[in-house]
Design a protein with these regions (language model features):
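Hydrophobic/aromatic beta-strand segments within beta-rich folds
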Residues: 32, 47-51, 57-62, 99-121, ...
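Short, surface-exposed beta-strand/strand-loop-strand elements in extracellular ectodomains
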Residues: 67-84
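Short proline/glycine-enriched turn/loop motifs at strand-loop junctions of beta-rich domains
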Residues: 55, 65-68
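Short, charged/polar surface micro-motifs in flexible loops or helix N-caps
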Residues: 53-55, 78-79
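Extracellular carbohydrate recognition and processing domains
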Residues: 83-103
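Short, solvent-exposed aromatic-acidic interface loops
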Residues: 14, 65, 89-92
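Flexible, active-site-proximal loop/turn residues at the rims of small-molecule/cofactor binding pockets
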Residues: 66, 118, 135
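Disordered, acidic Ser/Thr/Pro-rich linker "stalks" and the adjacent N-terminal cap
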Residues: 1-52, 134-137
Length: 137
């Protein structure tokens, strides 16, 4: 099992609802702890990670800031038909980063969509998303 969401593993951000030249969405998958994606201040916000092939997702970990409600969705092809696999309300962490973990059996996916439905402030940030799993053979 390894991190399927790293850009060096071939993962790509194929959609993000906001982008800033200083804090682009690709920062979430660059493997660095100090970089991040910043949202533009309206909700909902979302991003989609495309994996290099069909994968089995075992767990997802998100390091973020100011997120209140989040939804994780997957699909196994290039359609827009996503299936919700988790919804959660995060606790406010004041000035500390939020680290949230999600565990699954084996969830098959080609794409992972993360929908930030609301936040504790106008802006939120995602520092890192880790997707542990294996390629489907």
């Amino acid at each position: 099992m390894f991190d399927l969401a790293l850009s060096e593993a071939g993962a790509q951000i194929i959609l993000a609802t906001s982008s800033d030249d200083k804090y682009p969405p690709e920062h979430m998958i660059d493997g660095k702890d100090e970089t991040f994606w910043a949202t533009c201040g309206l909700y909902p916000q979302e991003f989609v990670i495309r994996f290099t092939s069909l994968v089995n997702i075992n767990s997802v970990s998100i390091t973020c800031y100011n997120i209140r409600d989040i939804k994780l969705e997957v699909n196994s092809d290039d359609s827009q038909n996503f299936k919700t696999i988790e919804q959660k309300e995060f606790q406010s962490s004041d000035s500390a980063p939020q680290i949230e973990d999600f565990s699954f059996g084996n969830v098959k996916a080609q794409n992972l969509r993360v929908v930030i439905e609301s936040g504790y402030d106008h802006f939120c940030a995602v520092y890192k998303i880790t997707v542990n799993g294996t390629a489907v053979h």
